Amino acid sequence: MSSIKSISDGLVLDTEQEAWLQGWLSKFGAWVYSGRLEKRQSSIIAEFMATVEKRDYPEREMCNDDDGMLITKVVDKIYHIDRAAFTLLLLRYAFVSSDRAIARYYYGIAQPRQMVRRNRTLEYRKPSMATCRREVKEIIRSAEYLIYPHLYNAFKIRDSEWKKKNNDKNVLTSLNQ
């Protein structure tokens, strides 16, 4: 028996964590889509953005450059783990693609594989659109589950460093008085 649990085994974010993460990823997606991410900063995301066609969206809330670069470092880890998951995340958050549009993309790149039919026989075939929709949903949830602790810790570390830096300045200015 495998020791790795699937999403259905309880490895999901709670509502509060999910809202926090999706808020930051949405701001990050708007930041990436705006073109503020330079190629020299993150070639992985910039390379992907160069391959897709941009669409006009109403003004979306965007994170600042410091937050964007911090999130980029965390999201780039997903690229090295699973490129398909990375692409699906960018489609969801940078291009604000619907679940169906993401599933259509995933269906287009899906390779035939051995699948169990309703009569419990194995057959080598391409997954259906419904299967792709379910898989996309699970892949995005899994990627978000992987990103959350790293992103939360990155923000926490950055905030504590910022507070320490400001406290050091306050100590120095109080000594001068």
Residue ranges and their predicted role:
Residues 1-80, 108-113, 120-124, 128, ...:
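N-terminal interaction/assembly modules
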Residues 88-89:
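A short pre-motif secondary-structure segment
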Residues 92-96:
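Short helix-to-turn junction characteristic of helix-turn-helix DNA-binding domains
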Residues 97-98, 127:
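Residue-level signal for the short linker/turn that defines the boundary of a DNA-recognition helix
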Residues 100-105, 110:
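Residues within the helices of the helix-turn-helix
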Residues 130, 134:
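Key DNA-contact positions within bacterial/archaeal DNA-binding proteins
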